[in-house]
Amino acid sequence: MEAFSQLVQQAAQAFEKARTPAELEDAKAAFLGKSGELTARMKQLASLPVDEKKARGAEINAAKQQVEAALTARRQAMADAELAQQLRAESLDVTLPGRRRGSGGLHPITRAMERIEAIFGSMGFEVADGPEIETDWFNFTALNTPADHPARSMHDTFYVEGGQVLRTHTSPMQIRHAVRHVKAHRAALDAGLPMPEIRVIAPGRTYRVDSDATHSPMFHQVEGLWVGQNISFKDLKSVYVSFIRAFFETSDLQIRFRPSYFPFTEPSAEIDMMFGSGPLKGRWLEVSGSGQVHPQVIRNMGLDPERYIGFAFGSGIDRLAMLRYGVSDLRLFFDGDLRFLSQFK
């Protein structure tokens, strides 16, 4: 029995000396493996008498249980030591302030577009949509823009393959909408019946070769169109003044219409506004182009300009957003600086 006690002690010492799981497995094999000390003792039982075999077998089993217990204890000690080391390496100071999870928000241009759509929606205007890569017909010809017009120059317009262009305004969406509207009511028109009015706005991205603090090669525009049988300049003024007051949430402003020229309207006017208070008080600010729809544009919609007339306007959404939020540099909207954009949540 004393020999087995020494064997158990040797095994326990070997396990304690092991510093890695691999070394511990080697020590285990030395005592419990196929060629280990205890396994060799078990094999020797076959040559012993029956009575002695029983007593010696009990001693070996007792020694084996003690060795296995020592092995289990060493494994647990090594696991505890490894866990303690990991905890020390990954320790956290729970007194430190937590990190706030960032939250997203609508871009200020998106906010402005949604506001514009809501205001005109309350006036009965539909919202049109259309492609940003346009044909020459819808972008220029249908809008009475002649082939020699400066707007067709490569200095002002982005051309793509196939003679198409990145739309320079959102008016093409109005023409597409009007053509679909007229086709849908062609039977009534042919019968001499009045057609339901075309009342639509077209917000979206547009592209021109321009870039500075107040201009971008990509910018957002909203254009409005109202075509019917008795639409006048008075209606244009009423609608736009109502819109601008609702957009800026104030009646403390003035609006003026200045004579101008656009190939798709006749007569045409620039629309300026002036705040009655605030940092921009007393300054006339250009916010839109407008006018009565040119008769040729009415024809291109499929309507008789002798019976139908309308007005149109086009405003820069980025410009309106700059004025609403007090932003002096247009490029701030598109730099992706979260310090700037987070102000609009």
Swiss-Prot record:
Keyword Ribosomal protein set for record: no
Predominant subcellular localization, coarse grouping: cytoplasm
Domain of life the protein comes from: Bacteria
EC category name: ligase
An example molecular function term from Gene Ontology annotations: tRNA binding
UniProt GO BP: phenylalanyl-tRNA aminoacylation
Stored PROSITE patterns: AA_TRNA_LIGASE_II
Keywords of this entry: Aminoacyl-tRNA synthetase, ATP-binding, Cytoplasm, Ligase, Magnesium, Metal-binding, Nucleotide-binding, Protein biosynthesis
Cofactor(s) for this UniProt protein: Mg(2+)
Quaternary structure annotation from Swiss-Prot or TrEMBL: Tetramer of two alpha and two beta subunits.
Protein name in UniProt: Phenylalanine--tRNA ligase alpha subunit
Organism: Methylibium petroleiphilum (strain ATCC BAA-1232 / LMG 22953 / PM1)
